[in-house]
Amino acid sequence: MNSETLFQRSKQVVPGGVHSPVRSFSSVGGTPIFFSEARGAYLKSVEGNDFIDYCLSFGPLLFGHRHPEIQEVVEDTVNKAWSFGACEPYSLELAEFITERIPWVEKIRFVNSGTEAVMSALRVARAATGRNKILKFDGCYHGHLDQLLVKSGSGLAGLSSSDSKGIGPEIIQNTLVLPLDDESKLEELFQREGSNIACLAIEPLPANYGLLPQRIEFLKKCRELTTKYGVLLLFDEVISGFRVSFQGMAGITGIIPDLVCYGKIIGGGFPVGAYAGKRELMDLVAPSGPVYQAGTLSANPIGMRAGLKTLTKAWTENPYPALESATKQLTDGILTLLSEKGDTNWEAVTFGSLFWLKGKTENPIRRIDQIPGTHKSNFATLFHKLLKQGVYLAPSGYEVGFLSTAHTNDIINLTLEKTKKALKD
């Protein structure tokens, strides 16, 4: 059994051979690796080869693959129940744990993905304001719901397209799009459309079209204008929530949203999303209010208990400073090795345990139109050199990398040894 054979078989029965576009390697070329096992910082391919993993399932695995403490909880849960479709104590425990530690999360509803979370939060925003228009930003990805799949990132970036076919103009006619980091255009739009906008949705740390940290002044302007015009501010913290700090970007910046969406880490490696916010907004959700949202597997016991164990460890152990330091150690080491080989055209953007290797630019990149045109092909070359040595990055130059607590000092040093070998090719 090998990846090439499996990929050809998969293409016969699965669109493009994959269940999420970026996995196809279409952005970097070549045949995607099929993996069969994972533990700690490592993936094992079906061929039996080990790879140091810096994709980490695109972010959920704060403590690495199959952390023993989390696995123990999962196995215990599997022996008790898989799904109830009824009330259970586990989601209550997780909800209480979060609301007691994040003041702006007064109530929370669990769903099965970040896409579901954002979709539901927008519904709440429209109901609460009586308005229909949604404002988003070019390059911010909020899942594959129709209204926000406009000028997005994630897999669409790798496909050289910012929109999806099959979304009618009548669906997105109420979607407004602006570039990031442009306060004047933001003010102009609010002066013109402010009374019609239900919600401003933003990744406070855009991380789906590269890593584009925003100026605090821009995020403050989003909060200022939404408050002034009665627009709800939605922070999409599916990636940044519990990843850059326990309280996410809202906690770091002190900018408090009306609604917030979570995913990835909140489920401890299982498919869980959540939307949350002020009590008066969340009380609009059925059955307490008129905004309908439901799900067969929402708050499934495996995801709830894995999530609670993960967040408990994150809260009590506070791995964030060490992860930030390890991320800098990794990226500084890679850049040094590239420079020693005479390639000084790279730099790294880091934020906490997220990193993005990119072409060097004169000024920090905050918008997607500032990304060098050569980035995609340059990254693809570096990706395959590292892959050949057993280092696995996300297979797109527009996806970010992640570290976990499983990425010890020894593993980072081994990664740098492998990088040195890769650059000799």
From Swiss-Prot:
Transmembrane segment boundaries: none
**Cofactor dependence:** pyridoxal 5'-phosphate
Q: What is its EC number?
A: 5.4.3.8
What Gene3D superfamilies is this protein classified in? Answer: Aspartate Aminotransferase, domain 1, Type I PLP-dependent aspartate aminotransferase-like (Major domain)
Give the sites modified to N6-(pyridoxal phosphate)lysine: K264
Q: Which Pfam families match?
A: Aminotran_3
**Which GO molecular function, any one, fits this protein according to its record?**
transaminase activity
Q: In which pathway does it act?
A: Porphyrin-containing compound metabolism; protoporphyrin-IX biosynthesis; 5-aminolevulinate from L-glutamyl-tRNA(Glu): step 2/2
Q: Which SUPFAM superfamilies match?
A: PLP-dependent transferases
Record keywords, A-Z: Cytoplasm, Isomerase, Porphyrin biosynthesis, Pyridoxal phosphate
**What is one GO biological process annotated to this record?**
protoporphyrinogen IX biosynthetic process
Q: Which domain of life is it from?
A: Bacteria
Q: Subcellular location, in the record's words?
A: Cytoplasm
Q: Which reaction does it catalyse?
A: (S)-4-amino-5-oxopentanoate = 5-aminolevulinate
Please provide one cellular component term from the Gene Ontology annotations of this protein.
Answer: cytoplasm
Give a yes or no for keyword Nucleotide-binding in this entry: no
What InterPro entries does the record tag this protein with? 4pyrrol_synth_GluAld_NH2Trfase, Aminotrans_3, Aminotrans_3_PPA_site, PyrdxlP-dep_Trfase, PyrdxlP-dep_Trfase_major, PyrdxlP-dep_Trfase_small
Oligomeric and partner information: Homodimer.
The entry assigns this protein to a family as follows: Belongs to the class-III pyridoxal-phosphate-dependent aminotransferase family. HemL subfamily.
Q: What is this protein called?
A: Glutamate-1-semialdehyde 2,1-aminomutase
